[in-house]
Amino acid sequence: MARIDASGLELQEKVVYINRVAKVVKGGRRFSFSALVVVGDGKGHVGFGLGKAGEVPEAIRKGVEDAKKNLIVVPVVGTTIPHPALGVFGAGRVLLKPASKGTGVIAGGPVRAVLELAGIHDILTKSLGSNNANNMVRATMEGLRSLKRAEEVAKLRGKTVEEITG
C-alpha cells in the first residue's frame, strides 16, 4: 500500500497516553517518557505513532512524526462506517458497528480519539479484552484498515453493487 503524503493534509493531533518509565542505574533512577499520539484530518485520514524521549514534549513530537508515517484512509459513508468490523491487536479487540445519524461516537478514550480524528461522527464500539491504550488504538486501526466500500467489494467479486447489497 502506498504511503500517504501528510504534507498536503491539515492534520490535528491528540495525545492519547503518556507513560513515564524508570531505568534503575547505580546513581538512582533514570526517567524517560513515551507518548502515544493519534493524528487525523477529520476527512478519512488517520494514523498513530509512539514517541520515546527523555522529555515529554520531545516524546510527543516524535510520536507525531511517527503517526504521519502511518496514515491510513478510512472509508467513511456519510457520517459512519460501511459495515461492522472487529479489530484485533494482541489481547485487545475492538468491535466497530455503524450507527444511524445523530447517534454520536459511543466509544472509550483511546478508541474515541482515533474515530474522531478519522472523521467518523456516528458509530458504536465495544472494547473486548485488553484495555491497554496502545493495544486499543492499534486494534481500532486494524478494524478501520479492514473496512471496504460496497464498490470495492463489487469490483473484487466482478459483480455490481446491486447484486451485493441485494
Swiss-Prot record:
Which InterPro entries is this protein grouped with? Ribosomal_Su5_D2-typ_SF, Ribosomal_uS5, Ribosomal_uS5_bac-type, Ribosomal_uS5_C, Ribosomal_uS5_N, Ribosomal_uS5_N_CS, Ribsml_uS5_D2-typ_fold_subgr
Biological processes annotated in GO: translation
Q: Name one GO cellular component term.
A: small ribosomal subunit
**A GO MF label:** rRNA binding
| Key words, A-Z | Ribonucleoprotein, Ribosomal protein, RNA-binding, rRNA-binding
Q: Which SUPFAM superfamilies match?
A: dsRNA-binding domain-like (SSF54768), Ribosomal protein S5 domain 2-like (SSF54211)
Q: Where is the S5 DRBM domain?
A: 11-74
Q: Record's superkingdom? A: Bacteria
One Pfam match: Ribosomal_S5
Task: Spell out the HAMAP family in the cross-references.
Answer: Ribosomal_uS5_B (MF_01307_B)
Family to which this protein belongs: Belongs to the universal ribosomal protein uS5 family.
What function does this protein fulfil? With S4 and S12 plays an important role in translational accuracy.
Q: How does it assemble?
A: Part of the 30S ribosomal subunit. Contacts proteins S4 and S8.
* Domain-level remarks: The N-terminal domain interacts with the head of the 30S subunit; the C-terminal domain interacts with the body and contacts protein S4. The interaction surface between S4 and S5 is involved in control of translational fidelity.
Q: What is this protein called?
A: Small ribosomal subunit protein uS5
